[in-house]
């Protein structure tokens, strides 16, 4: 096995401050278990931790049992890549199967939300239930970890007992939206080595080191769906109920295969051609009428039916675990990679808030998460219960 001290990266040396002998000695007392996904971000994160003097071991999590004939999750290939990187870095790689926990705590909730007509975000739930709960507990209790680490593009500030969650330095890759359910305690038990650098630098470090994952494509989509079509996947678990597509005025303009296949603000894939007596402006989904099984659409990107003045959110998680009891000015994202929206939080009770936007917003989607910020600090968030017109 390659000794970890033999590997070096000029790119790393350029972008990371050299630690003092005292800092290295202090870090050497700490054991870090890094979640190795078989991707470039966790691969480079492991190297960075080694350079910072920590005792580093990897853990590969298998969270989904594929069908034998349809290996969509590429788990075998990802494990092989994670093992190749671990071997290159001279690092032990543990393996664990969390498929049962994933099914019970992530996947069943995902299906139930779709049944209820909402559009859930399983990545957020996976981080909450698997990566920063099952993994964190296993690493601490079974592997003796002082910290866990992941390849997420986020940062932390403050000491371990009073840590804050910050956006990643790379605005294009910032993943704090997916981690808003973490408590300050969980953040304090976690390290995010690539949060302070930009993605191209991560790739360059991997190339410097000759890692197998250096040119590997970023994973897209939800793990358990992989590269297959979302519609085909969902149909295996939930019976579809076709119905009518109507305009806000009640005019029938088409048919849908099932409300669960559609989300608010959606334009593509509606299958509505030119409709006699209507303009050629594209149609957008503005409502899912569950009672009548009707998909309601409106024409034009700026149609007032698409706009929301705010939202109601529940299932709140604040990073500092202190409920908000007074009105608060901040910004919010109602979906990943959205530009921040200026808003005011108005608490209704400790688990429900009203959020009023400074400017009306399109496609505020029940089931998705609203995540709040003050500057770079992620305050926390909640699940959108309803949009306010």
From Swiss-Prot:
The active site is at residues 126, 223. The record marks 152, 368 as: Interaction with tRNA. CDD domains: MnmA_TRMU-like (cd01998). GO terms for molecular function: ATP binding; tRNA binding; tRNA-uridine 2-sulfurtransferase activity. Keywords: ATP-binding, Cytoplasm, Disulfide bond, Nucleotide-binding, RNA-binding, Transferase, tRNA processing, tRNA-binding. It is an enzyme of class 2 (transferase). Residues 121-123 are annotated as: Interaction with target base in tRNA. Disulfide bonds join 126-223. It catalyses: S-sulfanyl-L-cysteinyl-[protein] + uridine(34) in tRNA + AH2 + ATP = 2-thiouridine(34) in tRNA + L-cysteinyl-[protein] + A + AMP + diphosphate + H(+). InterPro entries: MnmA-like (IPR004506), MnmA-like_C (IPR046885), MnmA-like_central (IPR046884), MnmA-like_central_sf (IPR023382), Rossmann-like_a/b/a_fold (IPR014729). Transmembrane segments: none annotated. It is found in: Cytoplasm. Its EC number is 2.8.1.13. GO terms for biological process: tRNA wobble position uridine thiolation. GO terms for cellular component: cytoplasm. ATP binds at residues 35-42, 61, 151. Residues 173-175, 335-336 are annotated as: Interaction with tRNA. Catalyzes the 2-thiolation of uridine at the wobble position (U34) of tRNA, leading to the formation of s(2)U34. Belongs to the MnmA/TRMU family. This is tRNA-specific 2-thiouridylase MnmA.
